[in-house]
Amino acid sequence: MATCRNRTARWIGLTILGVLVLMIIKSCKSSRPDGAVVVKPFDADKYLGKWYEIARKDFKHEKNLNNVTANYSKNADGSIKVVNKGFNYKTKEWQEATGKAKFAGAPDEASLKVSFFGPFYSGYNVIAIDPDYQYALVAGESLDYLWLLSRTSTMPEDVKDDYLRCAQAIGYNTSDLVWVEQSSKY
């Protein structure tokens, strides 16, 4: 009987260890789609502040959200505080999520990892930005995540077109982007 318990305990221990190792490996790297090249040099201080989401690949954490903004500020430890906010047009309620971003490598490269759920990080890669840091194209860790961001609630058509071409060249299907309503009525 004791041998059976020992085997079970050992199996559970090895399973937990395996899961922890996978979590550590996943959280230590920032991934991005093949062909996506991050902005370098990147000025994190110029990137801080409020950004409006113009378009995105839809996923469960942003489902049914309009008026989406992201606000970036520096934490005391040098990481970046991320506050995402959006209005759920189905429930008629504001939703907010606070997370933390860290550089995946050198601080002058726009390859970051962001977490809203404890030790679990996802890739956040600025792959295009204008010289004045007014418009940005952000790739996630796979072709399932993409954002077009602007410092204002609109983006000029020529910038949109350039960013869409850039995303398509990497392999993104941009026909299913959600174009976010930015309205003052909420």
Give the role of each language-model region.
Residues 2-186:
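A beta-rich soluble binding module of mature secreted/lumenal proteins
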